[in-house]
A protein has these predicted regions:
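Conserved acetyl-CoA-binding loop-helix of GNAT-fold acetyltransferases
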Residues: 97, 103-116, 143
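Conserved beta-strand segments that form the floor/walls of ligand-binding pockets within enzyme
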Residues: 77, 91, 96, 127, ...
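Residue-level recognition of the GNAT/N-acetyltransferase active site
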Residues: 98, 131
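A conserved beta-turn-beta hairpin within the catalytic core of GNAT-like acetyltransferases
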Residues: 82-92, 102, 148-149
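Conserved GNAT acetyl-CoA-binding A-motif
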Residues: 111, 118-130
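Acetyl-CoA-dependent GNAT
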Residues: 7-8, 12-87, 111-113, 117, ...
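Short acidic/polar active-site loop segments enriched in Thr and Asp
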Residues: 62, 124, 147
């Protein structure tokens, strides 16, 4: 699969929702850390977060932020992938709205933008995972038209 250039993405977002924009700079990532930490509380260091994102970018990971009056209130991390199960798809690694802004449609707006991006990039679907115990997120995804399609298994390894 030919992964679209990131330069293409801002124009797709700008046409659709002016409150959304890519989070590309180190400053952007630092401002994203407190919001991301609400989804990923195990992330305790801003410097480690920025370093991880920079490594993940080498694998195609990108972040989009949603802004209310220049304040970052929600974000989505995604990447384009292709496999034998789904074909070409957009995978959503992270989707979170700051606690104080939940219910204000920021998550919906981000998902809509990601769907437009996936379609414009020739993807066959949008895929994401959520924890089995995360009933609130599951209700949100069902309301947004996403359906369950798989059960993921994992095995935790002891670290040396």
């Amino acid at each position: 699969m030919k992964v679209p250039l990131h330069n293409f993405i801002p124009s797709v977002l700008d046409l659709a929702d002016t409150a959304l924009r890519p989070l590309d700079s180190t400053h952007d990532l630092c401002s994203a850390f407190p919001v991301m930490q609400q989804l990923r509380p195990h992330l305790t260091s801003e410097a480690d977060f920025v370093s991880r994102i920079e490594r993940m970018r080498l694998e195609g990971y990108r972040l989009i932020g949603a802004f209310d009056a220049d304040v970052l209130v929600a974000l989505a991390g995604y990447r384009f992938q292709e496999n034998l199960v789904y074909g070409a798809f957009l995978y959503v690694d992270d989707l979170v709205t700051a606690e104080a802004q939940r219910g204000d449609q920021w998550g919906s707006r981000l998902l809509q933008a990601l769907e437009r991006l996936a379609r414009a990039s020739g993807c066959e679907r949008l895929v994401l995972y959520t924890g089995l115990a995360n009933a609130r997120a599951q209700r949100f995804y069902f309301r947004e038209g996403l359906l369950t399609g798989a059960l993921r298994f994992q095995k935790q390894f002891d670290t040396p």
